[in-house]
Amino acid sequence: MALSQERKREIIEQFKIHENDTGSPEVQIAILTEQINNLNEHLRVHKKDHHSRRGLLKMVGKRRNLLTYLRNKDIARYRELINKLGLRR
């Protein structure tokens, strides 16, 4: 369920703003989105795994807060990220 280091590096390379960027909202949202997608696949198979479902809800809430922050901070970056990730909003 956890992301491999290689996959995390790929996501960081794809969404980074500058050379040493690992913590910008875009990178954090992209990593959370990947984790959420993986957990969704897990929960489709294991429907009664309520502990993982709670973790999923926490991740979705954290991503929502980061998206709200980015929307308030820079709407252009927000719209670009939404289109790249294919999120509804």
UniProtKB/Swiss-Prot annotation:
Gene Ontology MF terms: rRNA binding; structural constituent of ribosome
A Gene Ontology biological process term: translation
Record key words, sorted: Ribonucleoprotein, Ribosomal protein, RNA-binding, rRNA-binding
Listed Pfam families: Ribosomal_S15
SMART domains linked to this entry: Ribosomal_S15
Protein's UniProt keywords contain rRNA-binding: yes
Cellular component GO terms held in the UniProt record: cytosolic small ribosomal subunit
Keyword Glycoprotein: no
Quaternary organization: Part of the 30S ribosomal subunit. Forms a bridge to the 50S subunit in the 70S ribosome, contacting the 23S rRNA.
Function: One of the primary rRNA binding proteins, it binds directly to 16S rRNA where it helps nucleate assembly of the platform of the 30S subunit by binding and bridging several RNA helices of the 16S rRNA. Forms an intersubunit bridge (bridge B4) with the 23S rRNA of the 50S subunit in the ribosome.
Family: Belongs to the universal ribosomal protein uS15 family.
Name the UniProt record assigns to this protein: Small ribosomal subunit protein uS15
Organism, scientific name: Geobacillus sp. (strain WCH70)
